[in-house]
Amino acid sequence: MFNKSLPGVLNTAKSSFALDQNSSEGEVMMTAMGQGKTTVSPYHMALIAEAVANGGTMMQPYLVESVTNYTGSQIRKNVPKSYKKVMTSDEAAQLKEYMTAVVEEGTGSVLKGRSYTAAGKTGTAEYSMSDGEKTHSWFMGFTNVDNPDLVISVITEGSDGSSRGKAVAIAGDILDAYYN
């Protein structure tokens, strides 16, 4: 799904990474963990989280579940449709287990004990070391782990090193507002 258009109605930038036969081992390692010349959008990260939540199947995204007119009659309803299988169900189950552990005992633990369960992945992308460490703080995940119903992806750009967990806190605020 890198270097390609993503499914759905949003016109987003392509996520990308740049490796070739001349790439050093260091560049390959940095790219493998999402650093280096890797670029990825929050939309793409939400699609990845959604595929994990759905047992490896990426669904065709849509923005609005249904539309009703002024009389309350439903005039359009989007029905979930499979887009493509992007990982095996065993791979998705393993990732779901890891992502649950991030919330239960790791860097996403600020989401533990809420009115919903969550699984997710936090991340920090460093982008400037010249005048102090500058980072992007990430969180992507899903809620109601046993029967997933909502996916979220948050990035805070241009943070200083002290706000590494900012994205997961913002995700918590958004999810709390949704569920409460």
List each model region and its residues.
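Short, gly/Ser/Thr-rich active-site loops of penicillin-recognizing serine hydrolases
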Residues: 74-81, 168-180
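Short beta-strands and strand-coil junctions in structured, solvent-facing domains, enriched
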Residues: 160-162
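Short, conserved glycine- and acidic-residue-centered signature motifs
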Residues: 41, 164-167
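Beta-lactam-recognizing serine transpeptidase/beta-lactamase-like catalytic domain environment
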Residues: 1-156
